[in-house]
UniProtKB/Swiss-Prot annotation:
Enzyme class: isomerase
Any single biological process term in GO: galactose catabolic process via UDP-galactose, Leloir pathway
Catalytic activity line of the entry: UDP-alpha-D-glucose = UDP-alpha-D-galactose
Active site: Y149
This protein's name: UDP-glucose 4-epimerase
Keyword Isomerase: yes
Annotated GO MF terms: UDP-glucose 4-epimerase activity
Annotated substrate binding sites: T125
EC number: 5.1.3.2
UniProt KW keywords: Carbohydrate metabolism, Exopolysaccharide synthesis, Galactose metabolism, Isomerase, NAD, Plasmid
């Protein structure tokens, strides 16, 4: 670390040992942007964090810890990933989600105000839309979440808006669609032991690390009868976060935008692409629809391109699948898989 880097303001990344947080830390490091991360490592992986990034092991629910880190590392902006993200779990453990995702975000925003930090990039979700009336889903679509996970994220969005109106805090809220894939250089990826994301689950089934892939519903009103989702490569998502940070550091105002490509792929398309990439057959079974699964979830993606100048580099489905499969194969050679998709600075 150079003296100049040590003296530069840092961006605080919460949950930097998790799936998305670690990719963003690598993107920041690649761009020469100093960062520090807080993660309690309850689900994140220490080795996913770039060597140049200081790790403070702890819980973002601690106001004292946040105050100290923001002061000691001269933090001027925050990227907030830490939290709980499993939709079915949120239904059976709703209060855990309101604590980890909403109450801890309140603690974080309070620390920002005390430290005079007025720039926040927030990891939100398309789950705030609930069951959309039409696709593609634009940012002005109704927000009617149908599970505590989506509701907990929407509450944090509202806190950011209110803090902006009252205190001048500026934020970029990024609503993710279906994040998938892994760092093309193999530095990090999704290492969740019990995965629920389709592409990761399909790769694990292909490699014999879990039972055959269950395809839920083949009678949807889609071209091949299976659900369609907008899959975005995690490295493109990480680049969007860097652009959002630079926008705020240039004095830009608050933004709300979807993170997706504006086009979707069906479950059958994902499976077929994985088979083409691997040259092997994915073991799969067919099951009834899952309650609450919309036929299509596709982002309206014009705003992020227009307002941040975001240009995806990894938007081919075969590239997303290939990077995910390569990462899964690398995990076969390692011991233990303690990772998290969204970060783990506070997680039940």
């Amino acid at each position: 670390m150079t003296d100049q880097t040590a003296a530069s303001p840092r961006v605080l990344v919460t949950g930097g040992a998790g799936y998305i947080g670690s990719h963003v830390l690598h993107a920041l490091t690649d761009a020469g942007i100093p960062a520090v991360t807080i993660d309690d490592l309850s689900a994140g992986r220490r080795e996913a964090i770039p060597a140049a990034v200081p790790l403070v092991e702890g819980d973002i629910g601690s106001a004292e810890l946040l105050d100290r880190v923001m002061r000691d590392h001269r933090v001027d902006a925050v990227m907030h990933f830490a939290g709980s993200i499993v939709v079915p779990e949120s239904v059976v453990k709703p209060l855990d989600y309101y604590r980890n995702n909403t109450a801890n975000s309140l603690t974080l925003l309070g620390a920002c105000l005390r430290a005079g930090i007025d720039k926040v990039v927030f990891s939100s979700t398309a789950a705030v839309y609930g069951a959309p009336e039409s696709v593609p889903i634009r940012e002005d679509a109704p927000t009617v979440p149908i599970n505590p996970y989506g509701a907990s994220k929407l509450m944090t969005e509202q806190m950011l808006r209110d803090a902006g109106a009252a205190h001048g805090l500026r934020s970029v809220i990024l609503r993710y669609f279906n994040v998938a894939g892994a760092d093309p250089a193999g530095r990090t990826g999704q290492a969740t032991p019990v995965a629920t994301h389709l592409i990761k689950v399909a790769c694990q089934a292909l490699l014999g690390r879990r039972p055959p892939l269950a395809i839920f519903g083949t009678d949807y009103d889609t071209p091949d009868g299976t659900c369609i989702r907008d899959y975005i490569h995690v490295s493109d998502l990480a680049d969007a976060h860097v652009l959002a940070l630079l926008h705020l550091r240039r004095g830009g105002g608050s933004l709300l935008m979807n993170c997706g490509y504006g086009r979707g792929a069906s479950v059958r398309e994902v499976v077929r692409t994985l088979e083409e990439v691997s040259g092997e057959q994915v073991p799969a079974t067919f099951a009834d629809r899952r309650p609450g699964d919309p036929p299509q979830l596709v982002a309206g993606a014009d705003r992020i391109r227009e307002q941040l100048g975001w240009v995806p580099k990894h938007d081919r489905l075969d590239g997303i699948v290939r990077s995910a499969l390569s990462w899964e194969r690398s995990l076969e050679q390692s011991v233990g898989q303690a990772g998290a998709p969204g970060g783990s600075a506070s997680r039940s």
